[in-house]
Regions:
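FIC/Doc superfamily catalytic core
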Residues: 1-129, 133-196
């Protein structure tokens, strides 16, 4: 069953997708790499490495259409209902280069700057898959690089995060407020950990 469908029966009601297990394991390695490279400027090559690390061993790695370790080859979108359109594949290399050059040129300390950067990365959606995970991880990295409290989007706040991305052009406060709330939550966790 693992070979034919890429799944394992967890119990009578559910399947475990092998690629999900691999990506979860790979995510830990990718996170360690990000922590080791906090002070490194973002480049296309850095993003390619993250994408390759996350997709290592998955079916996508063997599928040339997925272009693991490279930019997307086919159009994609964010979400399925009320989908947000993303940058066309031919425009991605220039869009990413421009975004990263502008970002790396100046220090950032305002959460709005980080929200704008994250929104722009997500709307470029440079990879065939896992753009959200990579985008949120580089947001974490760049907050650390700026000596600011990082954040993790909790599952319970994912709808607010997605709303923030969808409405960002009209009202950036949804995304900024969601990121700020997650930053506050992470601050509380760190403070509790330091008390132990």
């Amino acid at each position: 069953q693992v070979f034919d469908t890429g799944t394992i029966f967890a119990d009578e009601n559910g399947l475990i997708v092998v690629d999900d297990v691999l990506e979860t394991s790979n995510h830990f390695r990718m996170f360690d790499y990000v922590l080791d490279t906090i002070d490194v400027d973002l480049t296309s090559e850095y993003l390619f490495k993250l994408h390759t690390m996350l997709k290592r061993g998955t079916k996508s790695e063997l599928d040339s259409k997925m272009n693991v370790g490279g930019f997307k080859q086919f159009p994609n979108q964010i979400g399925s209902i009320e989908a947000v359109q993303t940058t066309l594949p031919a425009e991605v290399p220039h869009a990413i280069q421009s975004l990263l050059e502008k970002w790396n040129a100046d220090p950032h300390s305002n959460l709005l700057d980080f929200a704008k950067f994250h929104y722009r990365f997500e709307t470029i959606h440079p990879f065939s898959d896992v753009n959200g995970r990579i985008g949120r991880l580089i947001l974490f990295k760049e907050l650390c690089k700026a000596d600011l409290m990082p954040l993790v989007i909790r599952e319970s706040n994912k709808p607010f995060y997605l709303r923030g991305l969808k409405k960002f052009e009209d009202d950036d406060s949804y995304l900024v407020d969601t990121l700020g709330a997650e930053q506050d939550y992470y601050t509380q966790l760190v403070e509790r950990f330091l008390e132990i």
